[in-house]
């Protein structure tokens, strides 16, 4: 059974979100229309504002409404001399939530994937290299995902960064805190053994 074209359009738009299938999209649309019209209107306004006003930081490429994000605008963060390279703005939030990093970021907005047409230019690596030349960078921390593409991207960036005489490090990978060994896959266990530290 078809509903009004506007309801169908709303369901189709919600289906475009990651992880939202047809049934979930229908439930969300009906909930907004049946019970939460104020929430729906607020969602529409927030979505419109974000799509119109949120862009990318000119320095690190994360999301911001300004030309520079608050982290890049902070002299204290820049003075650390450390840049952490991540794949997505969500990675910045995850690291910031930990509260253990006080440097700046560089967001790739993806990873190298020649089959998908994603090369160094699409990742903004010329801007990263410009930072290595002009900013007082002492260390580059590569925090790309532990995937084949993430590892290839990290190696490519490390090769590029070696020309600039900075310390290059890669975040550790292995058994999560609170994880039980019997549930950890063999690749993660191998990484954990290879990356072990002395006590």
Curated annotation (Swiss-Prot):
Keywords: DNA damage, DNA recombination, DNA repair, Metal-binding, Zinc, Zinc-finger. The keyword Glycosyltransferase does not apply. A zinc finger (C4-type) spans 57-72. The gene is recR. This is Recombination protein RecR. It comes from Shewanella denitrificans (strain OS217 / ATCC BAA-1090 / DSM 15013). One of its GO terms (biological process) is DNA repair. HAMAP family: RecR (MF_00017). One of its GO terms (molecular function) is zinc ion binding. It holds the Pfam family Toprim_4. SMART domains: TOPRIM (SM00493). Residues 81-176 form the Toprim domain. The lineage of its organism: Bacteria, Pseudomonadati, Pseudomonadota, Gammaproteobacteria, Alteromonadales. May play a role in DNA repair. It seems to be involved in an RecBC-independent recombinational process of DNA repair. It may act with RecF and RecO. Belongs to the RecR family. It comes from the Bacteria. NCBIfam families: recR.
């Amino acid at each position: 059974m078809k509903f009004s074209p506007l309801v169908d359009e709303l369901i189709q738009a919600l289906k475009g979100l990651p992880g939202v299938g047809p049934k979930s999209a229908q439930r969300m649309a009906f909930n907004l229309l049946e019970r939460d019209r104020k929430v729906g209107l607020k969602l529409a306004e927030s979505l419109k504002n974000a799509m119109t006003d949120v862009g990318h930081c000119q320095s690190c490429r994360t999301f911001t409404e300004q030309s520079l994000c608050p982290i890049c605008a902070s002299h204290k963060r820049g003075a650390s001399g450390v840049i952490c390279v991540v794949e997505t703005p969500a990675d910045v939030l995850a690291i910031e939530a930990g509260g253990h990093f006080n440097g700046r970021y560089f967001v790739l907005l993806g990873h190298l994937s020649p089959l998908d047409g994603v090369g160094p230019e699409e990742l903004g690596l010329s801007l990263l290299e410009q930072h290595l030349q002009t900013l007082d960078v002492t260390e580059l921390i590569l925090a790309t995902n532990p995937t084949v593409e993430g590892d290839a991207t990290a190696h490519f960036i490390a090769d590029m960064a070696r020309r600039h005489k900075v310390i290059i490090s890669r975040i550790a990978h292995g058994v999560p805190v609170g994880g039980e060994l019997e549930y950890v896959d063999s690749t993660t266990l191998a990484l954990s053994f290879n990356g072990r530290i002395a006590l």
